[in-house]
């Protein structure tokens, strides 16, 4: 218990005091991320720059990273009646199928919980998502399954050409897709950045290699952080 209280004090000391702090786009650069190091043998906790990770590990240790690349999962569309909406993909495409959540008119500058409801749609409706013609296959509240006129590589190309990164109202400017990728991103599988690996920059990875630390990869999806609806958030993968 004494050790736990000490750990809490160290982490709590890093929190800004007073009112809520508005984060800026560059609030913490990848090189400025800090790492909480817990030493159970000495019952100590310290905070160090993340770049010191290679010195904390030993030759033969293994670091496993998630190599899922972040999709441009935010796409804007219209109904046949001209009503506008945003589609946020909730999973990678499968053939010609797109899985996602609809938000009403607006963009990331408005908090998700303050966005208007999306247009009403029904199975069989034809929509236009960016440049992609789709038909509604399933509807469950704001969750939808859409079938596109394109499939596989052609559909991926259109999504990458028209989509942007999902982001939220605490930032004012649109993020480029490269800004939400890890250094080792490979398979397009995450609808938001797998941010635990954000600070694993190339210099840290090279430092791990030089220290004899092994690096292995797996691909694991990262889902939507928020839809503005708590019940829907809990239902998403």
Mark where each language-model region is.
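A cross-family signal for N-terminal binding/gating loops and helix N-caps
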Residues: 1-237
């Amino acid at each position: 218990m004494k050790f736990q209280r000490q750990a809490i004090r160290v982490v709590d000391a890093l929190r800004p005091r007073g009112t809520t702090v508005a984060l800026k786009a560059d609030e913490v650069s990848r090189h400025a991320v800090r790492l909480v190091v817990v030493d159970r043998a000495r019952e100590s906790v310290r905070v160090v720059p993340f770049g010191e990770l290679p010195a904390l590990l030993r030759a033969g240790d293994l670091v496993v990273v998630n190599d899922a690349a972040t999709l441009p999962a935010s796409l804007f569309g219209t109904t046949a009646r001209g009503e506008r909406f945003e589609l946020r993909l909730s999973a990678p495409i499968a053939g010609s199928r797109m899985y996602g959540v609809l938000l009403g008119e607006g963009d990331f500058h408005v908090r998700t919980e303050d966005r208007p409801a999306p247009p009403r749609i029904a199975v069989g409706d034809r929509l236009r998502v960016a440049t992609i013609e789709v038909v509604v296959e399933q509807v469950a509240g704001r969750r939808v399954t859409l079938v596109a006129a394109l499939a596989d590589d052609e559909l991926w190309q259109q999504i990458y050409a028209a989509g942007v990164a999902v982001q939220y109202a605490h930032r004012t400017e649109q993020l480029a897709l490269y800004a939400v990728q890890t250094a080792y991103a490979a398979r397009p599988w995450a609808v938001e950045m797998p941010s635990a690996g954000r600070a694993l920059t190339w210099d840290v990875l090279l430092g791990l290699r030089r220290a004899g630390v092994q690096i292995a990869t797996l691909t694991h999806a990262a889902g939507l952080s928020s839809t503005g609806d708590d019940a829907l958030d809990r239902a998403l993968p």
